[in-house]
């Protein structure tokens, strides 16, 4: 609030987004903003109360709901989309593919667009939770522009269900000011040092694929293993490490930035964002290997605002818009048209584009891991220990 008690448009929008993302209660939102004070800016801020702009595809409604990962978009692009279409982008953030799958299986998610990872798409298809895409509604989609390694998973049995968003790797971020002059280079270092000089300062994902997968790599096993004996080894390690953790969370940037955490499992773009703002934080791919992944835009079955969903995906696929996304979040993109617009320092950045020998050791997630009961039960035991 300002000194005279009147909330500004920027403050109102910030509180509105916190409420829509579930970060605060409706009571908090109403109390902080004050309906009387907010009235002056409601016409510019609330969907349905602002005049709709003309849009080439016609009237798409006043809202579109996007389910996505933390720190994964340029908010200014959403504002530009709203200016162009009149549809407000409501963002729901999730921390794992299991969380996303469970939400869609339960029904009534209210989502229009979601961002699944490559290995999950066949499950969505088999459970009839995802819509085939009508490419005639995606004028900015050009299949030939995408690297097949990061695009092929979107097509199942010859039908296109998802289009590429970004790709990246899973490593760890370490605040080198606290490494005592001895660099961490492996998953063995990650877990061993967590139980030593990084005790109480380490975070792992709230996500079975990566937390279990990286524990498996400690022993030299496959990142995707569902072998009971190998999972038992990973569980013993995780239970041993648990008392030394700062937190189990997929939203680790705040703790790393504040200095509460010094070491965390980390995705490419987060590593780039942290390193850009705090050069003492390094992003490391464990030399044993780990995960390479690709994310996609998709539309869930029964999306309530289907026209707006297509409009948002098409808008975000436009090369100039996509380039702004990359510059904001730091995740590589598989679209050659977008890459042609990016500066060399992005395309040559070793965090975003690691050396080939490091990439060769990485594995794409396997569909079996998403629904394997042993992995799900292992993570539950680890979290409750």
Name each model feature, range by range.
Residues 122, 203-207, 211, 215, ...:
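Ligand-binding pocket segment of bilobal, Venus flytrap-like solute-binding proteins
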Residues 131-142, 162, 279-291, 300-303:
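Short beta-strand->loop
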Residues 1-28, 51-53:
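N-terminal secretory signal peptides
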């Amino acid at each position: 609030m300002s000194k005279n008690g009147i909330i500004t448009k920027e403050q109102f929008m910030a509180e509105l987004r916190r409420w829509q993302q579930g970060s605060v209660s409706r009571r908090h939102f109403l109390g902080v903003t004050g309906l009387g004070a907010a009235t002056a800016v409601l016409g510019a801020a609330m969907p349905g109360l602002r005049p709709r702009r003309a849009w080439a595809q016609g009237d798409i409604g006043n809202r579109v709901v996007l389910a996505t990962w933390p720190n994964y978009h340029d908010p200014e692009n959403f504002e530009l989309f709203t200016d162009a279409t009149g549809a407000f982008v409501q963002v729901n953030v999730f921390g794992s593919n299991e969380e996303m799958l469970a939400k869609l299986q339960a029904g009534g998610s209210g989502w229009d667009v979601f961002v699944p990872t490559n290995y999950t798409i066949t499950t969505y298809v088999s459970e009839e939770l995802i819509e085939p895409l009508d490419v005639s509604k995606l004028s900015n989609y050009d299949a030939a522009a995408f690297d097949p390694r990061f695009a092929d998973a979107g097509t199942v049995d010859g039908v296109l269900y998802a289009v590429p968003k970004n790709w990246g790797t899973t490593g760890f971020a370490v605040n080198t000011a606290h490494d005592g002059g001895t660099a961490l280079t492996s998953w063995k270092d990650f877990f061993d040092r967590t139980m030593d000089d990084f005790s109480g300062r380490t975070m792992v994902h709230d996500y079975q694929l990566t937390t279990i997968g990286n524990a498996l790599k400690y022993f030299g096993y496959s990142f995707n293993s569902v072998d009971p004996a190998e999972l038992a080894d990973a569980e013993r390690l995780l239970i041993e490490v648990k008392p030394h953790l700062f937190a189990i969370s997929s939203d680790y940037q705040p703790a790393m930035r504040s200095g509460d955490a010094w070491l965390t499992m980390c995705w490419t773009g987060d590593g780039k964002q942290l390193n850009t703002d705090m050069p003492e934080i390094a992003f490391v791919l464990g030399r044993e290997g780990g995960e390479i992944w690709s994310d996609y835009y998709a539309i869930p079955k029964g999306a309530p605002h289907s026209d707006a969903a297509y409009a948002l995906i098409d808008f975000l696929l436009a090369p100039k818009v996509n380039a702004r996304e990359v510059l904001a979040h730091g995740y590589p993109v598989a679209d050659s048209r977008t890459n042609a617009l990016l500066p060399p320092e992005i395309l040559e950045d070793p965090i975003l584009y690691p050396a080939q020998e490091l990439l060769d050791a990485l594995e794409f997630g396997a569909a079996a891991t998403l629904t394997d009961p042993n992995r799900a039960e292992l993570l539950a035991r680890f979290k409750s220990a």
